[in-house]
């Protein structure tokens, strides 16, 4: 996974100044193993026409959060930041783009007919944290281990969690990367798996990422894992059975709830090893310098219209830039075994819940701004790979269609997530006739 290089360096510099974190605390974003940014992308510099970024704590510069700003968050969520300064008229879409969008299905790639979406004004929104947002345990460092050991571990209280596994086999023998849960209490504990995304190990990393997302977004019956007192168990036998050959990727995402404190360990062991039996004797593997691991609270973000309701939408093109701190702040967390602060640049594993309630019909699409991008979206019960016919959106001159929204189904909520191996940021833009 790659956060476009120039965007990453610029963002790291600003975060250093803002937070005074030591340079050793900053771990670069997950790297795409294909070797960096794809040709034709604007990773060399930030868009010169980008509008200013609002302050998360004081969006209108009045030394406080107005009731109207905070009140824009729906019930069941809390205010995170406002993105309400969106100067300029909406960008008129080229006629060819409007025609292409009208004929396209969700997941189709369409040419933008010369339109530079970065010149469009933003859509005024408030950004909220859903009350049920999980804390994410993220394991991607060392990304390609060849030895046995603990990749990441944390002891967490009862609650809601997302477990994110992203590791390739750096050795010659078959290897697996299961999750092991330890109950250190005196009573049995339960883990309820609400969502699970898996794919067969492969060297086609982007394809693996999209397959995992589609599986994770699909409906499934909850599965309960019982962890007896003073016992270690596998979270999921299916993950334990994913045996990677050299350079193959194992990727998995789980959303779970737990009813008691548990120690969660992500481990690297040979394919034939009983992971639950050996975890207690495994040492912690050292993080590599290019990837991340850690525990990150609030891994879902809810994007809602800025108040007053219905006033933000204009005819033409408006956009939301995701993955560059304009809308979604970079997730902050900690590498629990070492205590080192972490920044999850690119916010991989974050679910964007977009609930705009647009009063007028519009078509939503995505433009890649930092490199080739792929992901998945769910509306209602329909889940779609983005893009559908190809692995990734490969240029800045095309867009992938997210679908129609607003008007009669203005209350529909989009669930959008970027795939492993993708580059960020992206522009989610809206075309209102």
Which residue stretches match the model-derived regions?
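Short, solvent-exposed loop/turn segments enriched in Ser/Thr/Gly
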Residues: 170-178, 248-252, 348-354, 409-412
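Terminal connector regions
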Residues: 242-280, 422-433
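Ser/Thr-rich, Pro/Gly/Ala-heavy low-complexity intrinsically disordered linkers and tails
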Residues: 25-78, 82
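Short acidic, flexible loop segments centered on an aromatic residue
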Residues: 169-171, 185-213, 364-377
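A eukaryote-biased signal for short, well-structured alpha-helical docking elements
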Residues: 96-154, 290-329
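Intrinsically disordered, low-complexity Pro/Gly/Ser/Thr-rich segments with frequent PxxP/GP/PP motifs
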Residues: 207-244, 383-411
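C-terminal functional regions that serve as terminal interaction/effector modules
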Residues: 86-118, 357-433
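Asparagine-centered strand-capping/turn motif at beta-strand->loop junctions
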Residues: 167-173, 180-193, 256-258, 358-362, ...
